[in-house]
Amino acid sequence: SMSHLKCLQTAKEENLPYICIFEDDIIIPKPNKVKNQVNRILESGIEWDVLLLAGNAFLPHKVISDDYICVNKCFTTTAYIVKSSYYDTLIDNIKKGILLLIQTKNSSWTIDTNWFSLMRQDTFLLLNPPTIYQMEDYSDIEGKEVNYKDLMLSIDK
């Protein structure tokens, strides 16, 4: 959470129109497909606050186009783009989550679960079909080796 917070704060300080945040365990097997999807979304003029390039999405969600869905519940912060107009909202959400995570030690305050409330009220889009996923690795949150590939490449669960 803290590294994501720092990225957002830096983007705000630098007046960047967008920031794209990637975690270090990302796998992008089809980079040209992702680039084309993102370009089509940016050119479409659709309103969005956060564009998730990857995620572990759960139903219900709304299929908007062949390139993206609107999500209400999507785990992981593997890769995403945030518009400058949304920096303050996400910064506040992450700060609150960090404080409550430290105080309670409850994993429901981790960045990728704490922002569910934002997903329900604002516009979080996820690339569809998903092609990006996290490499198999040890999860500090789960305390074990995890492999999310199949979960992240499916939106119908």
Regions found by a protein language model. Name each.
Residues 1-22, 26-157:
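An acidic/histidine-cluster motif and surrounding catalytic segment
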